Amino acid sequence: NFGLGISIFQEPASLDNYKKALEIAFAEDTAVLVEEFIPGTEYRFFILDGRCEAVLLRVAANVVGDGKHTIRELVAQKNANPLRGRDHRSPLEIIALGDIEQLMLTQQGYTPDDILPEGKKVNLRRNSNISTGGDSIDVTETMDSSYQELAAAMATSMGAWACGVDLIIPDETQPASKENPHCTCIELNFNPSMYMHTYCAEGPGQAITSKILDKLFPEVATNQN
């Protein structure tokens, strides 16, 4: 549905926070979809022609305290990383401190001007999208093959030859099975981002675009071979 994952509440929201979340959401569109919260860790599987080519662990926008700087200052420090930019022109996106992030801080009992204790991690978003300041970690080589096969089957069932499959997995050490998949699919993205798999904050990264080009222009790929 091309949703933005605007506000996510792990615990039941107060009426005031719920109203604020709706206010923020309706500023983006004329309709809002409210979905059930699914606990676990989110992974993006990139599927091409029925095969999993990459798996990404996306970590929500966050800062870690040093006992000296405010949350606002920590965000500025993190945004100084040359890997971060705007409008999808860099591997990672700038972290904002807008209404959504401040609502998230309020839920945790913080304000942007609070100083976090050393080592204290605070999330600024519930959703782990790279486009909202999240971090990308390539876990293709370590993700159990059962989940890769399941994600590929989901994309194939929808007739999508290129697809991003988002799975929430509570415990990735427990293999998926037909009887118990041990995961929940929260999205099938038919226009998946590729650069985040190649230029990761951590991990080796996976070359995706060249395989897409080979698919679209097989005559060129054949000539090169």
How would you describe each model-predicted region?
Residues 20, 149-153, 207, 211:
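Long, highly charged amphipathic alpha-helices
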